Amino acid sequence: MLLVTQMLFNVGFYLVVPFLATYMSQSLAASGTMIGLVLGLRTFSQQGLFFVGGALTDRFGVKPILLIGITIRITGFIAAGLSTTTPQLLIAVVLIGFAAALFSPAAEASFSVAGRSTEDSGIITRAELFALDTVFSRVGALIGPILGAVLLPIGFPLMCFIAAAIFGVLLISHALIVPAVSTPPSASVWNSLTTVLRNKLFIAFAVAYSTGLVAYNQQYLSLPVELERATGSQDAIGWMFVFASVFVLLLQMPLARWAQRRTATVALAVGFISTAASFALIAILAPFAPAAGWLGIAPILVMLMLLHIGQMVAVPIARDLVGIIAHEEHVGTYFGFLNSFGGLAVLISSLVLGRLLDFAHTPQPAATLPWLVLTAIMAASAIALPKIATIARSRKAQV
């Protein structure tokens, strides 16, 4: 049931969020910096506050935190649908983000506990369960943009209200049908927080891994800009998400199995090198006039493929590594902090990249700058994460 829930979460999310940048630029006349700020705050209010949801999950359990989070997200989508100015939309977007700060760590903790059980039983490994989670999530990420692309001509507010209705169904199903999931109890929220913050290896891992969320967030921030540079409009943005979702559905499990046969060191290095290459490609091409027709979109499609290959290889391995670094305790808080570091990284990078992306709408030498910055930080993580994984695995072997 958790897998189906993840799918529906993404249907509602991807019905609206991929179109935020387009709506703000075309309907609210927002600048690139303002769009970067709003998207960055959306991610930070979600990922940056995950540690709150994680600690509350460890203290009070999965189900109550899930229900509260879903209720807040319904409120956020309704508020977004009623927004007519950028400040109003900003408040709504923060609510949408904070809601996930509550329910997402609860779901992550559930998968970690369930994955350990299935691995001990010899059914599937925890990394493979996380990969299945990605597949189900991608089904939702496929349906959401398709539905959004169809509804976009009707209006952004209607899309928001439909998303609210989807989460309303989830609220009822979780309240009445979905059973509670048991996680290892925590003596207090403070105990969970201090335990995580004292784990220096985890802090290093979270900082290095935070760039992965920065990369993923570029689908909402940088992709529309590159699409406009290549085609003259952002109209095809929904179909770019559809392409990415189909690509992930086809390759997630094969690539996850490939990564499982390698060490975590190799998988993380390959994943982040692929992500760095995706941005390096656009950095090379951005200063030049795009080719005519579909050839102009080809580099964007290659960028998306390389980006998602990197995610598909690295993310299941990294999520499994969290449980190892955490010694299987306080997993909700650990996952919360992992995403909080990512959210902070996205907020900072969005402000910087949002400004640089103002130069990337048209071919010019300065258009390469945001893509060079992204390439550099992904390359840094490709170097750091394998070293951290080696230390974590060696400590586990000594226990």
Give, region by region, the residue ranges found by the protein language model.
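Juxtamembrane intracellular "pre-TM" segments in multi-pass secondary transporters
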Residues: M1, I177-A208
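Short amphipathic helix-loop junctions that connect adjacent transmembrane helices
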Residues: P18-T33, L221-A236, M240
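Conserved MFS/SLC helix-loop-helix module at the cytosolic interface between two early adjacent transmembrane helices
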Residues: Q47-T84
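Helix-to-loop junctions at the C-terminal end of transmembrane segments
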Residues: L49-G61, L250-A264, L357
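Cytoplasmic helix-loop-helix junction between adjacent transmembrane helices
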Residues: V94-S137
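A membrane-interface helix-boundary motif in multi-pass transporters
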Residues: L152-A165, R355-M378
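C-terminal membrane-cytosol helix-exit motif in multi-pass small-molecule transporters
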Residues: A165-T183, A384-I388
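C-terminal transmembrane helical hairpin of 12-TM major facilitator-type secondary transporters
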Residues: V266-V315
